[in-house]
């Protein structure tokens, strides 16, 4: 009896998840759909652990979100305009709660993706306040890179910002960009930018510009999708926040894939693009922070973080007004 009691106590303390390694690289759209569903099923199965099952409504909510996202994947595979509307409606139902959480949406300068736990005093480890203070006060820089074609040089600002509006046909090849709105993509290091560009250092040149958020730029409202298995497990003592992370993690799973082929149909971007449509149409959120899908694992944080910001104005000065930019 005592042995069974000890086992039960251990089970009740086991509010950790395992077996979810992100990002994921696959070879085809079909493999993306299949692998995503497998990972969602694996994640949902872990909600049957006693520690999670005893939390009122948590397991049911997470399993429902996983089921909705599996349906969204089927709709993405169909790919018609009617499916896009359905995807947006279903996805919105899974994410709307996260929009109203300070950890989920915050100013750029207070976002976990860029400042870690430093802005969240209630999550601090005792005795490390000096470290958190330095993290909060450190100016951070963002970067953008481009690979030139043979004989091409980049020396002007407009050559280093978002894709021009006359390149709308290419927007489907960008993770968060939509037909109507391009996105400005930035990274926390020049290294992650080079990975995103698929830069071959032996054969190609690389131009990099630094984008330093100014006072207004630091106030941009950012959706944080930098949510990892390690972070969730590290929040085991913070039940409410861990519950929110568990509910958003299925979305992080299905948006953390990279398909290694040249197909124009990029199904792994479908849900990311839907999320950006929701943000643009229904919220005052101004960008999305996420881990690069070109990295090897979640240990790339914080050096492998990307930021996607939708561009609403064709005017170059307005679209870059939130940054002090160092030319390439």
Task: Identify the meaning behind each predicted range.
Residues 9-136, 144-149, 155-167, 173-176, ...:
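Active-site and NAD+-binding cores of ADP-ribose-processing enzymes
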Residues 190-202:
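Short active-site loop/helix that positions an aromatic residue
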Residues 1-8:
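Short, small-residue-biased leader/transition segments that mark boundaries at the very start
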Residues 181-186:
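A short, exposed loop/beta-hairpin motif centered on an aromatic-Gly-Thr core
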């Amino acid at each position: 009896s005592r042995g069974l009691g000890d086992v039960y106590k251990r089970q009740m303390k086991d509010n950790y998840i395992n077996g979810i390694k992100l990002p994921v690289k696959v070879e085809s759209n079909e493999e993306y759909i299949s692998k995503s569903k497998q990972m969602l099923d694996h994640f949902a199965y872990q909600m049957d652990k006693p520690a999670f099952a005893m939390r009122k409504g948590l397991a049911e909510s997470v399993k429902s979100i996983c089921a909705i996202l599996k349906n969204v994947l089927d709709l993405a595979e169909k790919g018609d305009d009617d499916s896009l509307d359905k995807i947006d409606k279903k996805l919105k139902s899974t994410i709307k709660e996260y929009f109203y959480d300070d950890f989920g949406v915050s100013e750029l300068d207070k976002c976990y993706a860029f400042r870690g736990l430093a802005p969240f005093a209630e999550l601090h480890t005792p005795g490390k306040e000096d470290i958190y203070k330095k993290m909060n006060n450190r100016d951070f820089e963002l970067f953008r890179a481009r690979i030139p074609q043979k004989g091409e040089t980049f020396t002007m600002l407009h050559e280093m910002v978002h894709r021009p509006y006359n390149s709308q046909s290419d927007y489907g090849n960008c993770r968060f960009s939509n037909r109507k709105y391009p996105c400005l993509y930035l990274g926390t290091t020049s290294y992650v930018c080079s990975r995103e560009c698929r830069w071959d250092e032996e054969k190609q040149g690389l131009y990099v510009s630094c984008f330093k958020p100014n006072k207004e730029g630091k106030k941009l409202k950012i959706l944080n999708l930098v949510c990892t298995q390690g972070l969730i497990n590290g929040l085991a003592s913070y039940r409410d926040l861990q519950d929110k992370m568990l509910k958003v993690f299925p979305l992080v799973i299905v948006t953390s894939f990279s398909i290694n082929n040249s197909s124009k149909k990029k199904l792994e971007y479908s849900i990311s693009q839907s999320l950006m449509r929701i943000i643009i149409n229904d919220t005052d959120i101004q960008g999305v922070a996420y881990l690069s899908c070109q990295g090897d694992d979640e240990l790339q944080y914080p050096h492998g973080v990307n930021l996607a910001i939708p561009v609403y104005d064709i005017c170059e000065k307005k679209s870059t007004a939130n940054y002090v930019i160092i030319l390439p």
